[in-house]
Regions:
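Alpha-helical transmembrane segments of multi-pass small-molecule/ion transporters
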Residues: 1-323
């Protein structure tokens, strides 16, 4: 059973893409999930599961080698937001797409980065700690950067986004860490259940993002019309994220496994969180404002998967857990 669960979890990126395909061709499957607060609850559950995987010891790496963790956080919140803003301007994206694209670029790293780091034999402990740190920093940085960079397109309610991030990220993660601290035996018995639940929840959110865009008048035609430009934008964004993240680590003289981890944390974004924030804070621009998260999720999975495979082939097997 554990092998089956591990197989299911390791194919997380594939299930997300499958959900997009189902949502595009059979939107009724996910349409109900796009209504009300289902997406918010689903992302909160994902963040709760992330919190359950963390304990206070998870942050000990900060005290062992804090500079590399700080560098990963700086890379996350400079390379991606600025790249997203510049790409949106350079490609002349319509305002709804530009705002959605910038939200993706301003979000913290996603847990999928840990999977890419694991497969690619990057420094896994740095990846896990950096994902947690960027998620916590995102409580402030995501609303602030979205306000600064997307405010030229549409009015941005930074306080509203802050409330959303606190609700979706801070409270569930804090609750998860508390449960892990208070009831470690229970969390240990859960095994891989948290990762399985997270995979299902993120896949449901992915399908629920595209479904309402498809059923609107001319929805499929609009998505197809956006496809070429959005695939280009997403490829540039995540390609720059991986490339500049790796280069930044090299410039500061870090070993290859640390550079790979920084690249993963910079290049992979939390697309599910971006889609939910877009839905909650820009309802008048839905569902188009949620469309960029679809293309970004597909391209970051594709680029990350190719890099992980290449890194795995070219990297001797060794312990990649310690920072």
């Amino acid at each position: 059973m554990n092998k089956i669960l591990s197989w299911f979890i390791n194919l997380c990126a594939l299930w997300i893409i499958v959900a997009y395909v189902i949502g595009y061709f059979w939107p009724q499957v996910f349409l109900w999930f796009s209504r009300g607060r289902w997406m918010t609850w689903a992302l909160s559950i994902v963040m709760l599961c992330m919190g359950l995987s963390l304990d206070l010891g998870s942050f000990s790496s900060l005290f062992k080698q804090p500079k590399v963790v700080v560098l990963a956080a700086i890379s996350q919140y400079t390379v991606m937001p600025l790249s997203g803003w510049l790409i949106a301007m350079a490609l002349g994206l319509p305002k709804e797409l530009a705002v959605g694209f910038i939200i993706v670029a301003c979000c913290p790293g996603g847990t999928a980065s840990n999977l890419i780091a694991y497969i690619g034999r990057a420094n896994l402990s740095l990846s896990v700690v950096s994902t947690a740190i960027s998620t916590i920093l995102g409580i402030v940085m995501t609303p602030f950067l979205t306000k600064v960079l997307a405010g030229g397109y549409v009015p941005v309610d930074a306080w509203g986004m802050l409330r959303s991030v606190v609700e979706i990220v801070l409270l569930p993660v804090a609750l998860g860490v508390f449960i892990n601290w208070k009831y470690p035996g229970f969390v240990k018995k859960m095994g891989q259940a948290g990762a399985v639940i997270s995979t299902v929840a993120v896949s449901m959110v992915s399908g629920a993002v595209i479904a309402p865009a498809v059923v609107m008048d001319g929805g499929r035609e609009q998505i197809l019309a956006f496809a070429q430009k959005m695939f280009l934008a997403a490829t540039l964004l995540h390609g720059l994220g991986f490339g500049l993240g790796f280069l930044l680590g090299k410039v500061f003289g870090y070993e290859r496994d640390l550079c790979k981890a920084i690249a993963c944390e910079t290049g992979m974004q939390n697309g599910g969180l971006a889609a939910t924030l877009a839905k909650n804070n820009f309802p008048s621009y839905m569902p188009i404002v949620g469309v960029p998260s679809i293309f970004c999720s597909i391209m970051q999975s594709a680029i990350g998967g190719v890099l992980a495979s290449w890194w795995r082939i070219t990297t001797p097997e060794k312990n990649s857990l310690a920072v």
